[in-house]
From Swiss-Prot:
Compartments, as annotated in UniProt: Cell inner membrane
One GO MF term: proton-translocating NAD(P)+ transhydrogenase activity
Keywords for the protein's UniProt record, in alphabetical order: Cell inner membrane, Cell membrane, Membrane, NAD, NADP, Translocase, Transmembrane, Transmembrane helix
NCBIfam families hit by this protein: PRK09444.1
Organism of provenance: Haemophilus influenzae (strain ATCC 51907 / DSM 11121 / KW20 / Rd)
Gene of this entry: pntB
Name listed for the protein in its UniProt record: NAD(P) transhydrogenase subunit beta
Amino acid sequence: MSEGLVQAAYILAALLFIMSLAGLSKHETAKAGCWFGIVGMTIALIATIFGPHSEGTFWIIIAMIIGGAIGVQRALKVEMTEMPELVAILHSFVGLAAVLVGFNSYGLHHEALMPEGLDAAAQAAFVAEQAVLTNIHNVEVFLGIFIGAVTFTGSVVAFGKLSGKINSKALMLPHRHKLNLAALVVSALLMVAFLNNPESIFPVLLMTAIALAFGWHLVASIGGADMPVVVSMLNSYSGWAAAAAGFILNNDLLIVTGALVGSSGAILSYIMCKAMNRSFVSVIAGGFGNDVQVSSSEEQGEHRETTAEEVAELLKNASSVIITPGYGMAVAQAQYPVADITAKLRERGVNVRFGIHPVAGRLPGHMNVLLAEAKVPYDVVLEMDEINDDFADTDVVLVIGANDTVNPAAMEDPNSPIAGMPVLEVWKAQNVIVFKRSMAVGYAGVQNPLFFKENTQMLFGDAKDRVEDILKAL
């Protein structure tokens, strides 16, 4: 494949990636957006593998077949509830790939041969230009390894927290911000040392060790309530790691794709931080500004219990119902009976809508994906800002598997770890039914005063079983 054809294929692939992002921004066009991405990636892979500078094509194809087989097997096996962990571990692969590309490219920059017939001044200029190009390559290698290493360990920690293998609480080391700053300063000094003596790989090895520890500490010091932001932030890091690898490999498409992923992930992180009343810088810095007194996780009064039959009677007599799902709905796989209840109530003329918090679940858009999977109509699925003013005029709210995102302590308790975080104001409705397995605290480790309010009733048990019981009673 000629160089010109490869560049044309890269331009087409880049356009398809942009169309993919645009398509994924809306429910109606999400499937088309997914296909745009698949076609774009296929074109990019073919152009790269069979390009004029490609070597070892046979081994690359063998590696792709093995990797693809593992990927398909894992994707078919993984549950929708485990999607956040899968995304996190995939981000770690991008970071590790950037580290390996950086080390593989170390010392591979070859200076061009000096043309004959140059005078002394031209020769000096040529030598200076080659020195600059060598330094640029070494900077690309150094930064590519640094970003990749941070992404790798950060993503591994995120995977551990999301899968429950690592405690979700924030790691609060003494002087943690000074440690982060020291890691950055020492890494910068090591880059200067490396540029002054590129023959020595010791500064790169030392920086890699620091970057691995830095990435681990960044994510470990972020609490469970902020994990959805962490996933989108690591998505951004993986994009910049890919872009850095693109600079090292002199691959324009990898640079463009990495920049698209990096910028979109950063924008999504910023939007989610605003939705959680968190500073974007605080999340990047790893829990900066999160030093609040932990509010009591003790029970704060008597709670009332109810039954599926009583909830069914409430729903029969209601004219408006809002359902606020959370991660518990995903774990119980309750989205299908919830969709059935929605359809049955709408047949009776009840106005049923869904209120989705921006950080509900463990992944941006987690609840939207589950509801779309269960064929819930898009027009009844509303964001927090669109529905929060309607709770006061609502007869019944069903809180299915949500906890921290409906916690009034965020507005009422200034000492709460989630103080200031915008939440779904479900307690303003006439009746609130909370589906929970037990009275345990949520992912942020904070007790929820909602459970003890006069208009709240608790429906204990597996969310899917309880929703199916209500469906039978209807």
